[in-house]
A protein has these predicted regions:
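Hydrophobic, Leu/Ile/Phe/Ala-enriched alpha-helical segments that form helix-helix packing faces
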Residues: 16-22, 97-104, 127, 131, ...
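Structural alpha-beta junctions
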Residues: 2, 60-63, 103, 129-137
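Short catalytic/ligand-binding loop motif for oxyanion handling, primarily in non-cytosolic enzymes
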Residues: 41-43, 75-76, 117-122
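Catalytic cysteine-centered active loop of the rhodanese-like fold, especially the PTP/DSP P-loop
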Residues: 102-134
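Cysteine-dependent PTP/DSP-like catalytic domain, specifically the C-terminal lobe
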Residues: 125, 129-163
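Glycine-rich, flexible N-terminal cofactor/catalytic loop recognition
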Residues: 1-68
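Helix-loop module immediately N-terminal to the HCX5R catalytic loop
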Residues: 62-110
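Short beta-alpha junction loops
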Residues: 38, 72, 114-117, 142-145
């Protein structure tokens, strides 16, 4: 059974610390998809549940790590109060993600975004639907309830075009 675990940023970092995984010790059999916000959101959006200074990628990009920066919105682009723009996953990012997932479909996946509820869950939903013949062990503490529909649709569209 392969792991398909989705985390909040905080829980992801805790799990990586427990496993003692960093850039030097991350096993090749583990695949990480790290989703952070774009620079305009990191700099300009702050709330009780989001502080941009903590929204960073833990691992350097490498063969088994995909770092993506896009925002948790339900449309392609949103002009935000405060004069900045939030941007969802782009076609290029979705194509890259689909190819990356296809190349690593036989490994364990550890996926995170800030809350672990929307963007990362869209990836979990996509992977489970794209590879239904694989028996996935998902994170029981974080069920896939509210995946970002825009992200999910972009991944599915890319898969139809490139796989």
């Amino acid at each position: 059974m392969q792991k398909l675990y989705c985390f909040s940023r905080k829980d992801f970092n805790t799990y990586m610390d427990i496993c003692d995984w960093d850039d030097n010790t991350l096993p090749d059999s583990v695949t990480v998809i790290s989703i952070c916000c774009t620079e305009p959101v990191i700099k300009n959006y702050h709330s009780e549940h989001y502080q941009g200074k903590h929204d960073i990628h833990r691992f350097s990009s490498r063969n088994n790590v995909l770092n993506l920066d896009f925002d948790d919105i339900d449309e392609e682009v949103r002009e935000c109060s405060g004069g900045f723009t939030a941007t969802n996953i782009t076609k290029e990012q979705a194509d890259k993600a689909v190819a990356f997932i296809e190349a690593h479909k036989d490994s364990d996946f550890f996926i995170h975004c800030n809350a672990g509820k929307s963007r990362s869950q869209a990836f979990v939903k996509y992977i489970k639907e794209q590879y239904p013949y694989i028996e996935w062990d998902t994170n029981p503490k974080n069920p896939c309830l509210y995946p970002n529909v825009y992200v999910s649709n972009m991944l599915k569209r890319s898969a139809r075009e490139i796989l």
